[in-house]
Amino acid sequence: MRLSRYFLPILKENPKEAEIVSHRLMLRSGMIRQQSAGIYSWLPIGLKVLNKVCTIIREEQNRAGANEILMPTIQSADLWRESGRYGAYGKEMLRIQDRQEREMLFGPTNEEMVTDIFRSYVRSYKDLPLNLYHIQWKFRDEVRPRFGVMRSREFLMKDAYSFDLDYEGAKMAYYRMFVSYLRTFARVGLQAIPMRADTGPIGGDLSHEFIILAETGESQVYCDRAYLDLAVPGADTDFRNDAQLTDIVTRWTTPYAATDEMHDEADWAKVKPESQVSARGIEVGHIFHFGTKYSEPMGAKVQGPDGKEHLVSMGSYGIGPSRLVAAAIEASHDDAGIIWPKAIAPFGAGIVNMKPGDEGCDGVSEKLYEALTNAGVDPLLDDKDERPGAKFATMDLIGLPTQVIVGPRGVAAGEVEVKDRKMGERQSLGIEAAINMLTAQA
């Protein structure tokens, strides 16, 4: 993409309404625009990042055996009456009446609808286990939306729902999603720590929040430093191997980790002082087993191997892709702007033509652009006629992992300068050497 043809509305000043780093940088870099309180449009560069996050989530959900569907945003109130939640849900639910005076709602979550889909088609235990997921926009009318897309009223959510014959099957479905989430966050470039969460009236221990450590996090968290050294499950993980999954979950739940709500001082005291990490954290995912909470009132049953009907045991598993984008910025930025992990960077590299109109600079810039494009690097070529300082500031702000600087002096010497955004290191390379280095990383 050529910057001269790209819609990138950069803001020179920090927006006054932005309270945290991610909100400020997303507005400044032209990723999002606020349309009303807690509601945002995603602009081209922001949407590219969001789509990359969703692609990784999809790949890992599919790898774990989940099936993607797409449920509507507008739901019937009748389904929620079946589960008993319509009257219990507060003002955060946006309630709607259509022209036939039927009561509808803008879905804040999808347990009722997915249970209705399941009970309409599945009759036998032989069709289990089953995991259905979708990625869809949701709406919750927060009393005080703040922090940009970190706590917005409209947000994108990946929610998965598992259906099993019994608790043992549901536990393994939970373990599959647990491991899938570890891989998902690692691929996005984040180190997420699973922390035991409240299970409410269901009880048991199958509820975890996935937290990344960040100074601007909303939650106070406590964990054993051992988490920082744990190896994330590899691409060769066999999601059909229950023993392997159980071993991974055991390793990732043995060290101490808790949010402020679940913190236990007695258990915390057992952690060696040098291993104690007390920090702020951001929740980026939540997985939860809720048994027959929805299958019982909605009659979601299957015939078991004993010939009798059994209520299915269910779980839900959520990741907010839009929130995850903001969390990635909170975890990786500096005073100049965003520092994107390579996997979700909007472009693979930025080419900075320091002197558009100069035959040498134009020629080398075009050569680099064509070579990187053909290699699948997806470069952004800054071909705009602006002063060098503004060009560098833009590239640093939008956070592309690598910048290739093409200037008259370098071109005369047959070289370009390559800058690593994260490390800040610069090196001069021959043009072909630079192409080879960047295409090898594609």
From Swiss-Prot:
Keywords: Aminoacyl-tRNA synthetase, ATP-binding, Cytoplasm, Ligase, Nucleotide-binding, Protein biosynthesis. GO terms for biological process: prolyl-tRNA aminoacylation. GO terms for molecular function: ATP binding; proline-tRNA ligase activity. CDD domains: ProRS_anticodon_short, ProRS_core_prok. SUPFAM superfamilies: Class II aaRS ABD-related, Class II aaRS and biotin synthetases. It is found in: Cytoplasm. Homodimer. This is Proline--tRNA ligase.
